[in-house]
Amino acid sequence: MADRWDVSEELARLAAHIAKFRQTAGGGESEGRKLDFLIQEMNREVNTMGSKVGDAEFRWGVVEAKSCLERIREQIQNVE
C-alpha cells in the first residue's frame, strides 16, 4: 500500500518536465509543439499522482494542477 501512495518518481519527472518547459519557453524561437508535448507529459504525471493518492485534499490539488496545465496549453496554442 505504501508504494501505491509513493509519488516521488512522478514528482521528480514533473520537476524535470517543468525545468525543460522553462528552458524551452525562454528560447527565442517558436517552440509551440515542444511546449505542447511537455504540457502533455506534465498532465500525465499529475494524472498518475491523482490515481495513486486517495486523499481528497490531494485530489483537489490534482484538479487545480490539471486546470492550470489546460490554461497554459490554450496560451501555447494561441501563440502558435
Regions flagged by a language model, labelled:
Residues 1-80:
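N-terminal intrinsically disordered, cationic/polar leader segments
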